[in-house]
Regions:
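Hydrophobic/aromatic beta-strand patches that form the interior of the parallel beta-sheet core
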Residues: 32, 57-59, 78, 111, ...
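Pocket-forming structural segment of enzyme catalytic cores
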Residues: 124-206
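C-terminal helical/coil "lid" or tail adjacent to the Rossmann-like core of SAM-dependent
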Residues: 192-194, 198-230
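Short aromatic-enriched loop/helix-cap "lid" or pocket-rim segments at secondary-structure transitions
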Residues: 45, 71, 172, 188, ...
Length: 260
């Protein structure tokens, strides 16, 4: 076990990116984005990085892509979600889990989303588990920020979930958000610059349509929202999620977030 101690614009009302001309002219380091399906895409997160001048370095270890030995030449790394489990025995799951040690040791920004969050939790010795009553969270659900999140303001009240497993909070981590639903732990921070969320801030309207249209069996699971609530929920809640994501990524990419 690794042991460490130590679809667009939520910019401004005018639609301008909050970046000075000189900052735009400076070359930015690429961001590693780890995806888990052949045709998956990073949604709003990928769009944000492109819009703000960060090249995308997309890796799919499941299909044989190597992960960088160091993040010296990257601004950080994001591991997104997927249909597999952090408890699966597949080699790429082991590779990704152990690789998270690179940003942790180098104190580079890391952001785990859904499966990515669960991989971080597993790396740090926490449990990733199925609900004892076989409940899932699929759709929009309420969350509540908790604890001192000094520079993570404007948390959304409702977020998009698509998972059947949850995680315990690792020892030494700071809880950032909880819920009263089937899986109470929704976000945590660890160490210098690692953040994990159980929900999907990257989800676009097109992805909501695609996920719900292609997986009707998932919507029949205990606790899942009906399809029309996914659509209505996205229209109602996605703008606030994008405001939060924009503010978060601006600070995250610069390694400026402090948790006090």
């Amino acid at each position: 076990m690794f042991d460490v101690k130590g679809e667009l614009d939520s910019e401004t009302n005018s639609g301008r990116a909050d970046v000075t001309a000189s900052a735009k002219d400076r070359p930015r380091k690429p961001v590693v984005l780890v995806l888990h399906q052949e045709h998956s895409n990073p949604g709003h997160i990928g769009q944000w990085f492109v819009r703000n001048g960060y090249p995308l370095d997309i890796r799919r270890p499941r299909f044989g892509d190597p992960l960088p030995a160091t993040l010296e030449h990257h601004c950080g790394a994001v591991i997104l979600g997927g249909p597999m489990s952090a408890n699966d025995p597949e080699e790429f799951i082991k590779i990704e889990t152990e690789w998270i040690g690179v940003p942790l040791l180098e104190k580079k920004p890391f952001f785990g989303i859904c499966l990515g969050a669960q991989l971080l939790a597993r790396l740090l010795g926490a449990r990733v588990y199925l609900h004892p009553n076989e409940e899932v969270e699929i759709g929009y659900y309420g969350i509540l920020p908790t604890g001192p999140c000094s520079r993570l303001e404007a948390w959304p009240e409702y977020v998009y979930e698509w998972h059947k497993e949850g995680f315990d909070i690792p020892a030494g981590a700071t809880v950032l958000a909880r819920s009263s639903g089937a899986f109470p732990n929704q976000a945590f921070a660890y160490g210098h610059a690692a953040f994990a969320v159980q929900f999907h801030p990257e989800i676009t309207f097109a992805q909501v349509h695609r996920w719900t249209g292609r997986s009707p069996q998932r919507l029949a699971c205990k606790g899942a929202r009906p399809r029309h609530e996914h659509i209505e929920g996205h229209i109602a809640h996605a703008p606030k999620v994008q405001v939060w994501l924009d503010r978060f990524l601006r600070q995250w990419a610069r390694n400026e977030i402090t948790i006090a």
